[in-house]
Amino acid sequence: YIKTISLIVIVFFTSSCSKILDVKPVSTITSENYWNTENDVTGYLTGIYYDLRSSVNTTFYMEDRGDTFSPGLESGLSSAWQQNLTSSNAPNWIGYYNLIHHCNLVIKYGNIISFTNGNNKNRALAEAHFIRAFTYFWLLRSWGDVPIVLEPTESDQIVLPSRAPQGQVMDQILNDVNLAITLFPESGFVNKSRASKPAAYALKTDALLWKAKVLAGGDASLSEALVSADLAMAGVSLDPNFANIFSAKNGQEVIFSLYFKREEMFDQAGKKIEKSDQYGSTLKPRDIFVSDATNVNEIAFSRGGARSAYAPSQKFRDL
């Protein structure tokens, strides 16, 4: 009798647990249930810009490998600047492919979802194609041959692609940027902190110059770059006031910028500081080095952990 009751209890709880475990969690957001409205597309796209800021907010891949910088007032030069990269400290492309994955999601579902305004749909798709081209151009210049992934990864049943030749990667960059140019409904700017048709022409110009010089594109690529450069300059002009170039107001010289809100930069005491991983902090002097300067109010300086690890090189200043 006791054994029978025990068996019944075990069966009851086992079946109950099974039913509980089989319940589909209604609060879980996945690709299967997220993409429904145009707000889902535009909201997701805004999040991509956040990831883009993190990916390019570094000197590691570009300036550190060139001759633009020299040592600044404080230590902290990267291993890339010191030409001391090894298998243990070298960077990787995970963050960039994560960014590409998000763009692939917007492109896939943005094409499926209906928008009340066709221009808004085209602009969202254009921005996604622009960011994907921008990211692949970054990868191409850093690693050369890289895998080309044009579909989002929505299953663990995938085959990892091999690295594609640089010429093929460049073709994909230009395909994306040309499609972005076609899709943008405006010829000018809606928001200079987001991609636009002039920004797409500027990216195309940069890519064509790389193709001409590094990938043996020759005069044909240079000629196409000249045409694209003229189109990129529509609506912008040189500012007679040099200081305005560094203003947060996106002046008349700006074609594309990434937005950083000052309120993001607070220490634990609530004091406004510049985060040490902000791009500009590597070039600015610490406040303690300029506090006694007669023109301290005219000097851009950093607080807290930020420091001027770099200074413009003599070669750069001689330009």
Task: Show which residues each predicted segment covers.
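Conserved, well-structured interaction surfaces
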Residues: 42-44, 50-52, 73-143, 158-168, ...
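Elongated scaffold/linker segments in the mid-to-C-terminal portions of large proteins
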Residues: 78, 234-319
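Membrane-proximal, proline-rich intrinsically disordered regions
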Residues: 17-61
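Bacterial Sec-dependent N-terminal signal peptides
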Residues: 1-26
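Short coil/turn linking the two alpha-helices of tandem helical-hairpin repeats
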Residues: 140-142, 147, 188, 210-219
